[in-house]
UniProtKB/Swiss-Prot annotation:
Species, as recorded: Diacronema lutheri
List of residues binding heme c: C14, C17, H18, M59
Residues bearing the modification N6-methyllysine: K24
Gene Ontology MF: a single term: heme binding
UniProt protein name: Cytochrome c6
The keyword Metal-binding is annotated on this UniProt entry: yes
Family: Belongs to the cytochrome c family. PetJ subfamily.
The protein's assembly and partners: Monomer.
GO term, biological process aspect, one: photosynthesis
PROSITE patterns linked to this entry: CYTC
Keywords, in A-Z order: Chloroplast, Electron transport, Heme, Iron, Metal-binding, Methylation, Photosynthesis, Plastid, Thylakoid, Transport
Amino acid sequence: GDIANGEQVFTGNCAACHSVZZZKTLELSSLWKAKSYLANFNGDESAIVYQVTNGKNAMPAFGGRLEDDEIANVASYVLSKAG
């Protein structure tokens, strides 16, 4: 996906609750721990796409709010930050 666009979409829709940096805004909302989570999927962006589309626990589903390509771009961006 388009990482630059994914960063823009992330900033506009996800950054209020999530951080992709090691410094955490809130313990539960940081994606820093996603590095180990994402490693379980061997770089498969589909797991991120699924969670963003369908939501989980307190996180709302963005499937009706964002276009499929925007969600794919967010997944690419998050995965790029997870290293």
